[in-house]
Amino acid sequence: MKTLNRIAQVLLWLAMLGLSVWVGGTLYQMLVVVPMWSAAPPESVRAFFLGTKYNETIWNFFGPPFMVARLALLLGALLVGWHLPRHRKWLLVAAVCMAFGVVFTLAYVYPINDVLFAQAGGNHSPEEIQAMVRQWVMADRARFGVGVIGFLALLRALSIPIPMNGRS
């Protein structure tokens, strides 16, 4: 059990590091980047996404490989730490929240990204683009809220000592 507990502890720390970076990056995105393109759609959408390399660089931080890595570390901590009853419920909450975030992003947010980010609004009317911007911002805030709940649950799990003397 001692080795399993050490592995669980390492995975908890790595998962926390990954989610901490995500929380900070998402806050920056919400407070600094999103207002640049959502301020006055459709003009701001077209100016930002046609005039910057945002679509080329955003994948360096928020892309699917990083979603998978964050979730994999968390699921690894849950699986390896399943025998730790005091940690299990917090890890479950964190895993469910983050899994929801990934599924919601892929199923709901990315289709909007395709129109707003990749096509800079495309041939959609100004009203449609404005509506998509509002939907995206609300979805992003909801996704972040659920993610923060998961982050706090993981922080709680990390704050509970893991026994290293062989007991769970």
Regions found by a protein language model. Give the residues of each.
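Short, charged juxtamembrane terminal tails flanking transmembrane helices
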Residues: 2, 160-168
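Interfacial segments of alpha-helical transmembrane regions
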Residues: 3-20, 75-100
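Interfacial loop at the N-terminal end of multi-pass membrane proteins
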Residues: 7-11, 15-72, 117-133
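Structural signal for membrane-spanning alpha-helices in multi-pass inner-membrane proteins
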Residues: 26, 77-81, 105, 154-161
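Core segments of transmembrane alpha-helices
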Residues: 66-78, 146-151
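Hydrophobic alpha-helical transmembrane segments of integral membrane proteins
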Residues: 92-117
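C-terminal or internal capping secondary-structure element at the end of a domain, subdomain, or sheet
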Residues: 134-162
